[in-house]
């Protein structure tokens, strides 16, 4: 399951689980897969079995965990700690299930020196045009997180380096061996990033971008004084944002997890998926 969204990270569930567990996805057995994304919260349906395959906490209120939960693994240690506090039981963490994309798609020939992946909240009229203008002026490939998941994966694989506000931009880049840098701004959750980076023994030290999407939007329902203030802020921030992204693109200190650890995590997930399929078939 996932929430109705255009964000490619959440939609990875649509391609990964049918590939690695087709018999489970086609099964009439009761229950739902709670997989990729920050899905463990109060919005989860209370009825029915829930099979947790690498999901994490990060949005909304804490979930009500009951006997209908079957946790195979969670995204990272922070989610595991939260579930232990809620249930009194230990739960295994491995990493985000998007790591399995490396087993599905080939490595692509490089086309882009640096790609930028904004958070899905930046895909709004005004903000997206501003980011496009800045990226084009710097020779940076701008990847929309609202493209089809396979298209996003392909462009990331075609990149030599990735700068990303989107968590799954970093996860996919890391999976394909593409060095990456994390970005932060208001509205981007710290918890889910730390949860995943900790699972891969990586630091989380994002660069804070000097913008808010509202500064570039032109919403007539917003009072005129606030619209004016936003417009001024956008005019001031645009050259600052351009310089900041230029420095990040040309700088050092890119992240990439240990390749042996990636292989080990994939093997652990395959082991859990085999156990899951046997349980469903029994």
Regions found by a protein language model. Give the residues of each.
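Active-site anion-handling motifs in enzyme catalytic cores
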Residues: 1-282
């Amino acid at each position: 399951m996932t929430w109705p969204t255009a964000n490619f990270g959440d939609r990875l569930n649509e391609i990964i689980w049918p590939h690695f567990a087709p018999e489970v996805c086609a099964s009439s057995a009761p229950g739902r897969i709670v997989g990729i994304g920050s899905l463990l919260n109060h919005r989860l349906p209370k009825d029915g079995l829930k099979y947790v395959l690498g999901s994490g906490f990060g949005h909304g209120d804490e979930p009500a965990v009951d006997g209908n939960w079957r946790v195979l693994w969670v995204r990272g240690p922070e989610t595991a700690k939260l579930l232990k506090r809620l249930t009194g039981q230990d739960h295994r963490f491995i990493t985000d299930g998007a790591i399995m994309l490396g087993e599905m798609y080939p490595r692509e020939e490089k086309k882009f020196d640096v790609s930028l992946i904004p958070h899905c909240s930046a895909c709004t009229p005004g903000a997206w045009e501003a980011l496009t203008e800045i990226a084009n002026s710097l020779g940076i490939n701008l990847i929309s997180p609202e493209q089809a998941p396979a298209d996003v994966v392909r462009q990331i694989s075609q990149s030599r380096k990735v700068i990303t506000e989107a968590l799954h931009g970093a996860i996919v880049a890391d999976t394909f061996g593409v060095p990456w840098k994390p970005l932060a701004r208001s509205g981007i959750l710290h918890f889910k990033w730390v949860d995943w980076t900790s699972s891969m023994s990586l630091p989380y030290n994002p660069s804070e971008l000097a913008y808010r999407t509202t500064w570039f939007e032109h919403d007539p329902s917003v009072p005129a004084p606030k619209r004016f203030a936003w417009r001024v802020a956008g005019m001031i921030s645009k050259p600052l944002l351009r310089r900041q992204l230029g420095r990040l693109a040309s700088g050092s200190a890119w992240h990439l997890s240990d390749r042996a650890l990636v292989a080990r995590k994939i093997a652990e997930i395959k082991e859990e998926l085999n156990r899951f399929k046997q349980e469903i078939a029994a």
